[in-house]
């Protein structure tokens, strides 16, 4: 016996299932396998599922059909009594193996133990199938191997069961009635030999063949198991007196014989094991001993193959001897000599009790510990830690809706449900006219047969400006899409989603999924007069696509149509995206707005609709459904993300699935079986017991077929008669359609929202669908099955420690079934500590003044209604969990009462008038670092104590301080330093705290400085932040400097005095007194220094002149002679430090300049800065002169007290300053006030970081939603044309001519594809498309660059004209020789190359040639890159005249040749005399670069002579054509761009303030094609044209002193240079909508442009019905005669409405007088007056901008001036959309 005192382990695998609920055990395994704490369990279950799938697939078809589809083993366990049928043995064997190994693996993972039984004395034993489970452990060294090996055990178990059943059924067929008969009995009280005698006697006397004999399969001391075919067994026991009267019982062995050596042989074993299909290596070694149930000894197997062969042999042919097993185990344990014995098993059994009794009897002194491997599965492990996205639960965190009957938000929707209201009505007049479109008899074609429906109030209400839509776009956009945007926003707002705030809110990971099943608006309302936005506003995909576009979500965007289930199907698809990892946050919902009577007619004809009213769900009189509007949106993310993001979780989605009723009797008929399949799928996915579901929201349409089938499917799965529900398991049902009707595509989302609200309100609202009695097709035993259709409001409490499970159903008329399973949100830990902030920030914003005012008022009202609201939570919600807009108010308050007062003041008219929009660009920020004069004890104490980031930063810096040999500065912060700390400690504390504060501002709060300035000691922190010094070097230098001052200077011998006077005043008063200027802080704030005695004397003199003097509380006189002794030593210290170039500019008070380079600041600089004065005022002035700082710059004082801030305010009175800390003020109070100030200035802090350290201590509040500035955009359906079309007749022959697709191969570098070609007798039409991003086209464009952008030059349009002209003319008149005169070229908008890579930028060209006029017209169009649609209006037009007689041109030019040559000779002469400028090629194009940067191949001018607006040049064309052209653009440009050089380079032009661009020319003619081998000259004289800002001239092209070409009436427009960025930029390129280029110029618009994107529709945020303006197409006649309303004010005022205050604005003669304009309106009017040359008094409200001379160019200038000078972001189209001064004043008052 070994001398070993280690613990020994016995693991026993039985052959019986535990007595627990088997399905419940498998649900536990599946549910826990989704948690990453049970990775090996998951791996085992997945591998087992795969091997079972493979084995099932190998079965014959009849057997395969018996097995349901399964993704996990759970459906197999839920088959019911799987013992029935030919696969009973296989299923029982496999499931027992899965259960035992799964419980084994899970137990060890739950205990957190690394399973390594090889280090212990471990032995394994098992009985029957348990041996196979034990084999999985015997072959393993760790849990991961158990998972792999276990799958092989499952495979063999399944095969064993299949084989045994197959063989046994050949011995005796099963009972016809399905009765299960046992193949084994246990006999007790008799010996094995006695029983064997009886069996032998029976087998012999009955003549039973050996194959069918009755035999002993197992034996022990007290019992014997007898096996055989059931009928033979029965006969044997009947014939034997011994057996008939013995104590015996049947074993649950129903599928055949094992342990039968007479039946099976070696081939049988090989068939079962089938090693060739093994999923593990057959040579894998055996690691642990496994006892044979026959011999009791360990199997003598060395490999997996040998072990499975031995087990297979024993199971098929070996007799079980329990006594041998017990003896073998005892001997094994004795061999280990253990100190204790660990026994692990699965519950208990008769066999295990015998084993245990034997062990306790054999080892009475041994501690035996029995471990059950089952209970771990029932423990609560807290929130699931999903091992992958697919195993996450999902959290619904936001919701919003527009429901019928006034359910315009979720609270109002709940009121409808809680009050049990039925909201159906007749069809409102704004949808269609019931008097003409309703016929209950059904005789009128296309008429509705029911007048009823459920409708959203005023679905046209929309805040167009908020969503950057013009009124016309809003009007044409389907209200479904509009309200999808609105509810998406409201749901996101409720969820506190700020894009980019967290990983799960990364915009690229947010997707949208919306269900929609109809197109009423597009097909009816908008189609009456199809407009620009017919496609983008009506096609379904744009509904969710617009949400992605507006919010800039690059994630997935899907529009889902599954008929009536679309809304919930969209939720399911969205959930699937989360589970698949395709998105991290999803918006999902359903949309339905009814306007089209056609759908009423169609549904009526199909007998879908009730003619009596509302949906009567489960009522006996149910006769169809009642249609309904509905819009709903929800925000869903993975549960773990929601918890990490501190979201409010409304409910949790466990699973969701969709299938189809494919087996129904018709496509619209439901199918109970398919519905049940879907239910089982969701409960299996969630591993939920269906009996635990306590509420089901029915689809419940109120149709006879639908209600009957749904009741059957629901009850069969969730309330079966067996097993029945317990008394405490009441299942309650309801259907929202009985309240709000059937919302079709929105029905599912309405049901979903109802259940979410139930979770919120803890109540099940009454089902009001039963009007008479319950439908007789519904099962009668609802009460017996514990099912109730709740007809009263019923509490639905959440019990402690439990979760309510609910299910939502939604079925589509096409057959789709969607089901979602939900449970309660996790209970939130409310014991998280929060930092003690004395003051809190609260901010509110909006996009319009009216919305802002309403938002303020709504919050104030909310505070009144919720007096217990937590101020910290409110701060967190409004700051960190809201998107912030340009109109802002903010408060730093310490109480709710203080906030109420602040809101009251902010909501006053005067206060709102002062609110200005924050600038579009973040203002520059300068950090100012204060010097030692700001020192005090307890600096930043509150931040250090409770702001973890700041504390950690300080401690890291203090660690550096101490490692450098200095004393810790922490005592300065906590106040424990004592009185009069050393200069070293005080100065280092300043530097350290300022560095920490700077990091707080930059890294945490998001303030990125554009420059830094340090005052005296503060410069060390500034240099660290600017990257010149490392943190360690900065601290080292500051500390050593302080030590040297303490060492070399005497404290108190010198002093510093702050004097409220200028340097010159002080000098004048003090004369020759001894003092030094230490600091010049402002023009009238100077610090002087010197000996104490000298300063006392100076102070007396100054104060005697009434000049205020304040001693500076410092022990030394810095920047004076007192520090001279330290300079040499400090120099040596500083020279050891490495200085780097600044990463941001440094405003230097020493140099009074701004430092950008890496050489200026060095050791010498620091020495000078120590000794020389601090010229703070001079430094600021230098930064102002450079334009680095101005009135808009935001200054952050980074120091203990805002000393620098006061200096900045004095130097720049309008400066916006913020401070970090303030002496004698709580840090949080200071921080809060200044964060709000920065926020209002447009420097939005990273609010999330301000709360992040203790975010879990804050609660996201549900606050009033954003107050929309709504207008009712509605196109009313006019007339009866949906009825009339039923009577239209078609002749079918007279249609438009068919356009024959072109087979032409016209393709050049600029013309890429013909998309349409029509050739007639005398006319021809050609439509082509070109991609500007094509390499050859792009090269031509980039040859002409403006503002670093490639801009298409007019020579490109010229070549395209010549190319198309030649092509079409040859088509109509082949072989004809003509000359082409390109003319009337007018380019309205520039074409700028999009800088994005791998994009397309298509242009359309339409050309029409008429031989009768010998003229071709051309028009160029942009293409919308998103839709591929051609723009409605062209951006360029031109023509080509075909002239056969070129002699006319020659004659014309010969008369002019001598004049042109004479002017050239004159210019040559003037150049020789110095009166004209002679420019080389290089100089000419360098001068051109002022506006245009030409590529080398465009540079054809060799020499230029220019005087004022006249010039000629010598030209040499580059030889390369560089592509396929008619005439290369770079050649055309070379011979013609002399005119552009004159305008943009001549001394006569004001090129500083303006640049010049060409909108085109009247004609371009060449007698012969340009030739690179020919030398040319060009001559032009430009002159002003009568049209304002326009110049023109004729440009002549000469060859050998003969005119051979001409650009006639070449025009140029003067454009303010400040518009360069607007016209020529990457943004302009992407929009393709700029107004001018070197080849195009702005033109006065002939049509109104859309409203500015920032302009919301003009209406009160909460309009009353009587005052609500309505936007609708003014259709009073058939659609083709519709006259559109005025775009500028569409929907804002009807003709009957008077403008408020109109009567008061009229003067005595009825003329309109100018009201006094103040604030931003007054500033804008003054600016307009300055630019237009008008008097402000002339800008009366009725004055139009056309009258004032504001054309499109001037409007661009004004919008740019508004931005630059007033900080207002307005679009130039404002002056078109607001045609009068009064209109514009109204707009400014509202939005600025």
Swiss-Prot record:
Residues 1715-1792 form the Carrier domain. It is an enzyme of class 2 (transferase). Residues 391-824 form the Ketosynthase family 3 (KS3) domain. Disruption phenotype: Fails to produce asperthecin. Residues 1634-1716 are annotated as: Disordered. It comes from the Eukaryota. Residues 1308-1625 are annotated as: Product template (PT) domain. SUPFAM superfamilies: ACP-like, FabD/lysophospholipase-like, Probable ACP-binding domain of malonyl-CoA ACP transacylase, Thiolase-like. Residues 1694-1705 have a biased composition (Basic and acidic residues). Keywords: Acyltransferase, Phosphopantetheine, Phosphoprotein, Transferase. Residues 1475-1621 are annotated as: C-terminal hotdog fold. The keyword Manganese does not apply. It catalyses: holo-[ACP] + 8 malonyl-CoA + acetyl-CoA + 8 H(+) = 3,6,8,9-tetrahydroxy-1-oxo-3-(2-oxopropyl)-1,2,3,4-tetrahydroanthracene-2-carboxyl-[ACP] + 8 CO2 + 9 CoA + 2 H2O. Pathway: Secondary metabolite biosynthesis. GO terms for biological process: asperthecin biosynthetic process; fatty acid biosynthetic process; secondary metabolic process; secondary metabolite biosynthetic process. Multidomain protein; including a starter unit:ACP transacylase (SAT) that selects the starter unit; a ketosynthase (KS) that catalyzes repeated decarboxylative condensation to elongate the polyketide backbone; a malonyl-CoA:ACP transacylase (MAT) that selects and transfers the extender unit malonyl-CoA; a product template (PT) domain that controls the immediate cyclization regioselectivity of the reactive polyketide backbone; and an acyl-carrier protein (ACP) that serves as the tether of the growing and completed polyketide via its phosphopantetheinyl arm. Non-reducing polyketide synthase (NRPKS); part of the gene cluster that mediates the biosynthesis of asperthecin, an anthraquinone pigment. Catalyzes the formation of the aromatic polyketide from acetyl coenzyme A and seven malonyl coenzyme A molecules. Through its product template (PT) domain, catalyzes the cyclization of the polyketide backbone via C6-C11 aldolcondensation. Polyketide is subsequently hydrolyzed from the NRPKS by the action of the hydrolase aptB into endocrocin-9-anthrone. Endocrocin-9-anthrone is then oxidized into endocrocin by aptC. This is Non-reducing polyketide synthase aptA.
């Amino acid at each position: 016996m070994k001398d070993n005192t280690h613990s020994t382990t016995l693991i026993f695998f039985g052959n019986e299932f535990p007595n627990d609920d088997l399905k419940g055990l498998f649900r536990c395994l599946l549910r826990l396998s989704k948690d990453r704490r049970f990775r090996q369990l998951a791996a085992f279950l997945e591998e087992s599922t795969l091997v079972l799938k493979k084995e099932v697939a190998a079965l014959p078809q009849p057997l395969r059909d018996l097995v349901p589809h399964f993704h996990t083993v759970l459906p197999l366990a839920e088959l019911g009594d799987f013992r029935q049928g030919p696969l009973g043995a296989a299923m029982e064997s496999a499931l027992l193996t899965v259960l035992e190994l799964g419980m084994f693996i899970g137990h060890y993972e739950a205990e957190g133990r690394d399973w390594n039984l090889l280090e212990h004395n471990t032995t394994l034993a098992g009985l029957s199938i348990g041996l196979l489970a034990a084999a999985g452990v015997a072959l393993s060294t760790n849990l991961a191997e158990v998972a792999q090996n276990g799958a092989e055990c499952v495979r063999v178990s399944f095969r064993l069961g299949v084989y045994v059943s197959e063989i046994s059924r050949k011995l005796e067929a099963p009972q016809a009635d399905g009765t299960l008969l046992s193949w084994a009995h246990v006999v007790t009280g008799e010996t094995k030999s006695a029983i064997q005698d009886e069996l032998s006697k029976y087998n012999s006397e009955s003549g039973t063949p050996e194959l069918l004999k009755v035999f002993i399969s197992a034996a022990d001391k007290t019992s014997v198991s007898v096996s055989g075919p059931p009928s033979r067994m029965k006969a044997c026991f009947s014939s034997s007196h011994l057996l008939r009267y013995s104590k015996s019982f049947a074993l649950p062995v129903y599928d055949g014989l094992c342990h039968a050596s007479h039946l099976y042989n070696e081939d049988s074993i090989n068939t079962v094991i089938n090693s060739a299909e093994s999923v593990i290596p057959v040579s894998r070694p055996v690691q642990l001993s496994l006892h044979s149930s026959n011999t009791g000894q360990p199997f003598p197997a060395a490999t997996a193959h040998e072990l499975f062969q031995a087990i297979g042999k024993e199971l098929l042919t070996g007799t079980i001897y329990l006594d041998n097993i017990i003896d073998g185990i005892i001997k094994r344990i004795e061999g280990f000599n253990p100190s204790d014995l660990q026994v692990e098993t699965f519950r208990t059994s008769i066999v295990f009790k015998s084993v245990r009794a034997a062990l306790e009897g054999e080892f009475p002194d041994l501690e035996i510990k029995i471990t059950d491997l089952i209970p771990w599965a029932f423990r609560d492990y807290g929130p699931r830690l999903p091992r992958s996205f697919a195993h996450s639960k999902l959290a619904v965190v936001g919701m919003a809706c527009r429901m019928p009957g006034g359910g315009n938000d979720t609270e109002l929707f709940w009121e409808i449900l809680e009050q049990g209201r039925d909201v159906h009505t007749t069809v409102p007049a704004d949808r269609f006219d019931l008097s003409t479109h309703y016929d209950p008899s059904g005789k009128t074609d296309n008429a509705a047969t029911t007048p009823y429906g459920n409708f959203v109030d005023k679905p046209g209400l929309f805040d167009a400006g908020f969503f950057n839509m013009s009124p016309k776009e809003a009007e044409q956009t389907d209200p479904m899409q509009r309200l999808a945007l609105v509810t998406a926003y409201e749901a996101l707002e409720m969820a506190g989603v700020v894009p980019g705030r967290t990983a799960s809110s990364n915009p690229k990971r947010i997707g949208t999924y919306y269900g929609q099943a109809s197109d009423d608006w597009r097909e009816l309302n908008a189609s009456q007069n199809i407009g620009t936005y017919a496609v983008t506003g009506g096609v379904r995909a744009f509904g969710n696509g617009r949400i992605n576009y507006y919010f800039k979500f690059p994630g997935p965007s899907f529009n889902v149509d599954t008929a009536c289930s679309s809304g919930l199907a969209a939720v399911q698809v969205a959930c699937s995206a989360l589970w698949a990892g395709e998105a991290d946050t999803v918006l999902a919902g359903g949309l339905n707005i009814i306007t089209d009577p056609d759908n009423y007619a169609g549904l009526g004809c199909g007998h879908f609709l009730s003619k009596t009213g509302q949906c009567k769900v489960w009522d006996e009189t149910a006769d169809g459904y009642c249609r309904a509007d509905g819009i709903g949106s929800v925000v869903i993310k993975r549960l773990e993300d929601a918890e990490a993001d501190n979201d409010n979780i409304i409910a949790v989605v466990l699973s969701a699935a969709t299938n189809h009723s494919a087996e129904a009797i018709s496509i619209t008929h439901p199918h109970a079986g398919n519905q049940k399949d879907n239910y089982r799928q969701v409960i299996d996915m969630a591993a939920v017991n269906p009996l635990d579901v306590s509420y089901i929201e029915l689809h419940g349409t109120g149709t006879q077929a639908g209600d009957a089938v749904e009741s059957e499917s629901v009850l069969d799965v969730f309330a079966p008669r067996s097993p029945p529900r317990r008394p405490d398991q009441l299942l309650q049902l309801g259907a929202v359609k009985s309240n709000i009707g059937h919302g079709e595509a929105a029905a599912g989302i309405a049901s979903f929202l109802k259940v979410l609200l139930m979770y919120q309100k803890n109540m099940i609202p009454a089902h009001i669908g039963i009007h008479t009695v319950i439908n007789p097709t519904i099962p009668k035993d609802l009460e017996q099955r514990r099912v109730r259709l709740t007809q009263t409001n019923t509490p639905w409490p959440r019990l402690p420690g439990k979760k309510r499970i609910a299910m939502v159903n939604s079925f589509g008329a096409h057959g789709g079934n969607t089901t979602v399973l939900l449970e309660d949100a996790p209970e939130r830990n409310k014991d998280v500590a929060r930092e003690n902030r004395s003051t809190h920030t609260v901010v509110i914003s909006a996009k319009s003044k009216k919305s802002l005012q309403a938002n303020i008022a709504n919050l104030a009202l909310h505070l009144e209604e919720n007096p217990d609201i937590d101020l910290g939570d409110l701060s967190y919600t409004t700051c960190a969990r809201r998107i912030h807009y340009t109109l802002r108010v903010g408060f730093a308050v310490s109480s709710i009462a203080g906030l109420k007062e602040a809101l009251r003041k902010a909501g006053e008219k005067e206060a709102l008038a002062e609110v200005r929009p924050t600038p579009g660009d973040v203002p520059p920020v300068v950090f100012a670092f204060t010097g030692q004069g700001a020192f005090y004890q307890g600096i930043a104490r509150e931040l250090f104590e409770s702001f973890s980031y700041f504390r950690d930063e300080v401690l890291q810096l203090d660690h550096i301080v101490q490692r450098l040999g200095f004393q810790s500065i922490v005592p300065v912060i906590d106040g424990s330093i004592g009185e009069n700390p050393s200069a070293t400690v005080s100065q280092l504390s300043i530097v350290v705290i300022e560095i920490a504060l700077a990091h707080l501002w930059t890294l945490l709060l998001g303030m990125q400085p554009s420059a830094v300035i340090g005052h005296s000691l503060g410069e060390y922190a500034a240099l660290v932040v600017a990257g010149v010094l490392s943190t360690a070097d900065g601290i080292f230098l500051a500390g050593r400097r302080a030590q040297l001052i303490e060492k070399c200077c005497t404290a108190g011998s010198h002093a510093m005095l702050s004097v409220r006077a200028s340097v010159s005043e002080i000098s004048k008063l003090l004369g020759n007194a001894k003092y030094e200027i230490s600091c010049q802080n402002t023009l009238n704030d100077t610090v002087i220094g010197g000996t104490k005695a000298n300063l006392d004397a100076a102070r007396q003199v100054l104060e005697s002149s009434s000049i205020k003097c304040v001693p500076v509380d410092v022990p030394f006189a810095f920047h004076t002679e007192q520090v001279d002794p330290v300079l040499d030593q400090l120099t040596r210290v500083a020279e050891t430090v490495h200085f780097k170039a600044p990463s941001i500019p440094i405003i230097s008070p020493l140099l009074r300049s701004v430092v950008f380079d890496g050489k200026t600041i060095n050791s010498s600089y620091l020495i000078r800065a120590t000794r020389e004065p601090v010229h703070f005022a001079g430094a600021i002035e230098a930064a102002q002169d450079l334009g680095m700082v101005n009135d808009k710059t935001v200054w952050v004082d980074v120091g203990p007290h805002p000393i620098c801030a006061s200096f900045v305010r004095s130097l720049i009175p309008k400066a916006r300053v913020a401070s970090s800390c303030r002496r004698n003020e709580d840090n949080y109070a200071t921080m809060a006030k200044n964060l709000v100030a920065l926020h209002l200035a447009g420097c939005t802090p990273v609010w999330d970081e301000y709360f992040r350290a203790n975010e879990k201590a804050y609660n996201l509040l549900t606050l009033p939603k954003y107050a929309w500035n709504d207008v009712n955009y509605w196109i009313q359906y006019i007339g009866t044309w949906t009825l009339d079309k039923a009577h239209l007749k078609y002749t079918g022959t007279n249609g438009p001519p068919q356009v024959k697709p072109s087979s032409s191969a016209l393709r050049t570098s600029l013309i890429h594809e013909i998309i349409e070609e029509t050739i007639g007798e005398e006319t021809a039409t050609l439509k082509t498309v070109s991609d500007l991003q094509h390499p050859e086209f792009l090269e031509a464009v980039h040859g002409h660059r403006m503002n670093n952008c490639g801009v298409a030059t007019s020579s490109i349009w010229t070549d395209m004209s010549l190319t198309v002209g030649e092509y079409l003319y040859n088509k109509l008149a082949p072989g004809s020789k003509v000359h082409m005169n390109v003319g009337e070229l007018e380019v309205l908008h520039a074409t700028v190359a999009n800088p994005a890579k791998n994009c397309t930028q298509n242009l359309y060209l339409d050309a029409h040639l008429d031989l009768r006029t010998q003229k071709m017209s051309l028009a160029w169009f942009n293409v919308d890159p998103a839709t591929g649609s051609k723009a409605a209006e062209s951006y360029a037009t031109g023509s080509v005249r075909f002239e056969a007689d070129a002699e006319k041109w020659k004659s014309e030019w010969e008369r002019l040749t001598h004049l042109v040559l004479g002017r050239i000779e004159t210019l040559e002469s003037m150049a020789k005399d110095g009166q004209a400028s002679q420019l080389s090629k290089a100089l000419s194009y360098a001068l051109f670069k002022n506006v245009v940067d030409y590529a080398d191949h465009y540079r054809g001018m060799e020499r230029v002579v220019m005087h004022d607006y006249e010039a000629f040049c010598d030209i040499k064309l580059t030889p390369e054509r560089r592509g396929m052209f008619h005439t290369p653009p770079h050649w055309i440009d070379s011979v013609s761009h002399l005119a552009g050089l004159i305008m943009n380079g001549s001394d006569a032009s004001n090129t500083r303030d303006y640049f010049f661009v060409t909108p085109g020319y009247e004609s371009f003619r060449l007698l012969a094609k340009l030739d690179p081998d020919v030398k040319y000259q060009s001559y032009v004289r430009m002159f002003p044209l009568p049209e304002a800002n326009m110049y023109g001239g004729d440009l002549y092209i000469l060859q050998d002193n003969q005119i051979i070409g001409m650009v006639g009436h070449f025009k140029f427009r003067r454009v303010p240079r400040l518009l360069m960025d607007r016209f020529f930029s990457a943004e302009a390129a992407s929009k393709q909508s700029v107004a001018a280029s070197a080849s195009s110029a702005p033109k006065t618009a002939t049509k109104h442009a859309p409203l500015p994107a920032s302009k919301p529709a003009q209406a009160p945020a909460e309009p009353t019905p009587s005052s609500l303006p309505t936007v609708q197409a003014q259709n009073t006649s058939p659609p083709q005669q519709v006259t559109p309303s005025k775009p500028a004010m569409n929907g804002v005022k009807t003709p009957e409405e008077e403008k408020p205050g109109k009567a008061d604005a009229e003067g005595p003669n009825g003329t309109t007088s100018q009201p006094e304009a103040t604030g931003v309106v007054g500033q804008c009017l003054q600016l307009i007056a300055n630019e237009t040359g008008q008097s402000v008094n002339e800008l009366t409200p009725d004055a139009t901008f056309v009258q004032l001379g504001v054309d499109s160019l001037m409007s661009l200038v004004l919008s740019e001036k508004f931005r630059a000078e007033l900080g207002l972001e307005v679009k130039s189209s404002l002056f078109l959309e607001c045609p009068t001064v009064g209109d514009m004043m109204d707009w400014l008052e509202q939005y600025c």
